[in-house]
Amino acid sequence: MKNLFKYLVIFFLYCGSIHSHHPGNTVEVGEPYPEIFISIYEDSYDGYNIKIHMKNFKFTPEEISYEPKEKEGYALVHVNEIPIGRSYSKWFHIPDRFFNLEKNTIKVAIKNVNHQSLVADHTVISQEIIVEK
């Protein structure tokens, strides 16, 4: 019976975090808080290019998985709540195949080098924009 209980606990912990890259990992940052602004440009060949304007945040791809520094890391790009890739610079291309709804939501959130979401005033720092097809 003890083993069954252990397996059930492991199963529910796994299923509860199956859609999370790193479940429950957030870190509160101090002021001035990082800010994100998104510009979107239709690509002449396929999809869209987004420009991620950052304030009080530095992209540091060379530091991934090292000791985190406040307000440094990367941006995680989502389309319709599905994470599609990391951005280590201000430009990111999203192919047309990700835009399968009439109204599509692009969300950009920032993470530190240990993959923790950055939080200001108990809210994950992110920005969203709607793309209509």
Language-model features: where?
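Short, compositionally biased P/S/T/A/G/V-rich stretches that sit at domain boundaries
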Residues: S20-D43
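Short amphipathic, basic-aromatic surface patches that mediate peripheral association
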Residues: H53-E67
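Short, well-structured beta-strand segments within conserved domains
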Residues: Y48-I52, F99-N112
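Contiguous beta-strand segments within globular domains
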Residues: Y41-N56
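Short beta-strand segments within Ig-like beta-sandwich modules, predominantly Fibronectin type-III
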Residues: P83-S89
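Short acidic/polar inter-strand loop motif in beta-rich domains
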Residues: G85, K111-V119
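Short strand-turn-strand beta-turns centered on an Asx-Gly dipeptide
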Residues: V77-E81
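Exposed aromatic-hydrophobic patches
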Residues: W91-F98
